[in-house]
Amino acid sequence: MKNYFSILLILMLTTGISARETIDLSGKWMFNFGDTPTYNDSIVLPGSMLTNGKGHDVDANTKWTGSLYDMSYYYRDDMAKYREKGNIKFPFFLTPDKSYVGNAYYKKSVDIPKDWKGKRITLHLERPHIETTIYVNGKEAGHQMSLSTPHEYDLTDLIIPGKTNEIAMTIYNGIENVCVGQDSHSVTDQTQGNWNGVVGEISLKASSPKNVIHNVRVYPDVANKQAVVKAIVTNQNGKAKKSVAIATSSDKQSVITATKPIITGDTLTFILNMGDKMRTWDEFNPEIYSLKVNSGENSFETVFGMRNISIDGYDFHINGRPTYIRGTVGNCCFPLTGYPPTDEESWAKIFATCKEYGINMMRFHSYCPPEAAFSAADKAGVYLQPEGPSWPNHGVKLNAGMDIDRYLLEESKRIVDSYGNHPSFVMMAAGNEPAGNWVPYCNRWVNEMKNYDNSKVYCGASVGGGWAWDSESEYHVKGGARGLTWSKSRPSSDDDFAAEMKLPRNFKPTEEKPINTSPILSHEQGQWCAFPDFKEIPKYTGAYKAKNFEIFRDLLRNNGMEEMAEKFLMSSGKLQSLCYKYEIERNLRTPDYSGFQLLALNDYSGQGTALEGVLNVFWDNKGYITAPEWKEFCSEIVPLARFPKFVFSNSDTLSVPIEIMNASAGTIENAVLRYDITDASGKYYCKEEKPVGDIAIGKNHQAGVVNLPLAGIENPTKLTLTAELPGKAKNHWEFWVYPDEKISMPGDNIYMTDSLDSKAIEVLKQGGKVLITAAGKVTLGSDVVQHYLPVFWNTSWFKMRPPHTTGTYIDTNHPLFKNNFPTDDWSNLNWWELLNRAQVMNLLELPADYQSPIQPIDTWHVSRKLGMMIEANVLGGKLLMTTMDIDRNLDNRIVARRMRNAILDYMNSDDFNPQLVLAPETVGNFFTKQTPPIQMYTNESPDELKPKLK
């Protein structure tokens, strides 16, 4: 009966409330760009100048919004053809057809109904870029410059109802007034591009001038089962006292109302009592309420969720439950349009893909997305960290008296006002990697934002490891505790970042606070690159074209490797996936680590072309790891194995502890661990099942130890350990067992040396066999630095900082690998001994169609043909030369020992019959010639390469 009267009251109060009337202004507008408005052209909105084909043709002299740390494009001879008119292509980011920075002028005639007389009339512009100045019938209505939120103009005093009215917009997309920094993802040509236009809703709206509801904010109080609703209402009359707030669950089964608001000035405060059937919002059960506030003849609609975020020590809590962040960075890369979508469907697809890959959070790097992103995340159960639209660096500094100081705080409050009701909006940072005396500024920003809206948690800035520690941040997004140490030490899965949680880089202990006690999320974890997928090129059918990929494809073709493109993609991609797996697992097994933010699940189009995603920029899978495979190590429940190493001798006994990371919705009751070890044929070496008991939410739950004597394994064998909680989670790890064998020595029929010396020449002339172990000796290729780990981000942005290679392609059809050295066709972990910091040979003087059976994959910006082993008929003899170290410390390097023995066995077999004919001078050139160093033609560099970063 009580509910009946509540509903009756709602009906009584809402009777006679007219819907706000709207005129859609999308469609054709008169248009021009330049110094003065002439309106001699037309354009379609929503859209940008670029999507309409407007602007200046791009050429080699186009001034871009963004930093360039590699200017070689403008000087290299092999780039000259891409600087020619009609064939403009850029290697450092996607290529648009047009570019323009300046004023653009838009005008439209609109018939305004007579019955709008006496009403309040507003203009709504969703996602204009950047500054708008509005004129109505020739009179200025105002100016706004938000990069993140809609521009709203009150045109009541300028619109003439019953007449045709002229609405004109001047839109300016220069960045000097917003002062956010040229590499901010809100403006830079590295990502979305610095476009000019309006890309979301464009409309005129009429409403009552009385009881104008400007905004409604909702503050959930989960503990007390209440939601506090604050409505800003101006020009109130007596009807304001009869205002009502109505919350409705997503399934329409629950309706909660609040009447008789507390009126304090322009603020109406309602208390919604959610009751015992209150539905909370989180990643597992994203329950959403719609809210409608009625005051007089006006209404305001929004959404909210009963969601509380808090911090307890190192942990985030959502509604009182520990929550671990598995995030990716959204970089505002949308090649088809050049701007973020304003429709919910597009974002729903992105977030569904994130969930498919076990991701529960997205950080928006130096920008804030449109409202559609928040709405889609609400429904998907994805946590969001928008940022102030600024990377205040590379010409802009915080706390230095620049306009950014004022703009960033104002814009942050606008973001919270516009999108703060969305339950997915759980955290926020001021921006990315600031310059200047930024810590005092960001500390003030955090405290100001906490006071402004405490329904979120705040971080001063998302920063790399070299940046200072900002003490007021409620949580920290910080680099330093990320990456893998495999360029310096052999791979394992037994290390973690525990020490860096207590004493992060640049944390300054005090007597009051000797250690850090706040949550840390890894900043931009990953950045492992794979080779370009040239099959992707036809997908760029919109505003931006993958001309950078076309350049990289040409480089590969010009260097005789066109047919290697797909092999390079797959081999480098599998190594990339492996690196992501073990870095993510390292984070998950670190006590007190609150989570990670990957850079990124999908590719980044700019900054030199950073192909660091296992998905392309369109969020499509590239083909070398599936979502279920990825989710084994990136999910709410993950079994983890602590391998001390991944290569064993058959005289070893395997002993690997298993632990469980549980970030699910609750305790895993009566858990059972099942594990087995198999080889490629499916043969079981062990198979066990054991009860584990209850596993609470948290990390480092010990589940048992896998033990296996390896003595019975006589041949080189790859084994797989699989551990699972049946029906809940599964993970697997590959490891290798090699025989504890003697070091083979060359017989009388093979001359082994480290150079093409005179004896080698003589042996070859006599038709003999020569093995040259040239590790550390070659000069032709010495400028290419190889690590086991692949390129970080890309060599263009980081000015050829090593490593320069992205893995190695292994030709498994080569006889060497048939029996004596079984292998994958990529550099899996058993190759670490042979590849890490090993020299490569530059094969530029060999025939164009020759490919080494062990072929390191060079940076796609150069694509030198490389090799670590060549075979040739020289002077009638048979030569095999390798830069793998198969000579030193072989008692402790069992893979190198096996490779040495395998090579000697191969050279003694009938399979060793090189068809490539080389002159001795060509072989000798590997020891004498050098290629000139790659020049960047600029002294500018990213922050990470600057020695005194703060």
Features from the language model and the residues they span:
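Substrate-binding/catalytic cleft of secreted carbohydrate-active enzymes
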Residues: 361-615, 820
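N-terminal carbohydrate-binding accessory modules
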Residues: 292-354, 735
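Short alpha-beta junction capping motif
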Residues: 748-794, 873-876, 903, 950
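Beta-strand-rich binding/interaction modules
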Residues: 134-136, 226-262, 268-270, 653-692, ...
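Accessory beta-strand-rich segments of carbohydrate-active enzymes
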Residues: 32-34, 76, 96-212, 236-237, ...
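Catalytic beta-strand/loop cores that center a nucleophilic Ser/Cys/Thr
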Residues: 501-503, 776-781, 796-894, 912-950
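Extended carbohydrate-recognition surfaces in non-catalytic/accessory domains of CAZymes
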Residues: 20-124, 180-200, 208-209, 605, ...
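Extended acidic/polar, glycine-enriched regions
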Residues: 160-164, 235-311, 705, 712-743
